[in-house]
């Protein structure tokens, strides 16, 4: 399996681990996504898993779910379990399994994928998906009170891709502006900070040469 699909696989497994602590009673809990509670975040993640599986298997994504974490991003998720707490949680594992199967069956990395009005490759779709799924795994973990960090190795490998695939001009409606953190912040916290989250236990770093 190519590295792009391995990264997506690991991100999905991390997010599932975080979601394993969700319960129907927790679905109204706040999340790092300002306008979304845990239930909406889980439904959104399910929609994203469906879109990624569609992109990798049939090479076309009709609708790209809007990410949480940025202004104007509070649109309602459309997943089939969006109104059913127990089904929302259990359905996430089913949707993840479909995506992981699609990852295992992609023959290469340069197959074209139609995403809205753009033409990307399966590699780009997989890496972009890994970044989003990993950060939402962190969002879910924080919402559940566990604060399980993005695994260090996974975050270290995703950070260079995030810098390339999430430039400032593409952030509106997807991610908030980067949060400055101390230089010695862990890779997992640097990843979520780059994607607009304030890691637990960190303070805003003063901007300057060689910042975060």
Where are these regions (language model features)?
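Glycine-rich loop at the start of a catalytic domain that most often binds anionic cofactors/ligands
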Residues: 44-45
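Structured surface interface patches that mediate subunit assembly and partner/cofactor docking
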Residues: 1-7, 11-14, 21-34, 54-75, ...
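Extended, alpha-helix-rich binding/interface surfaces that flank or overlap catalytic cores
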Residues: 41
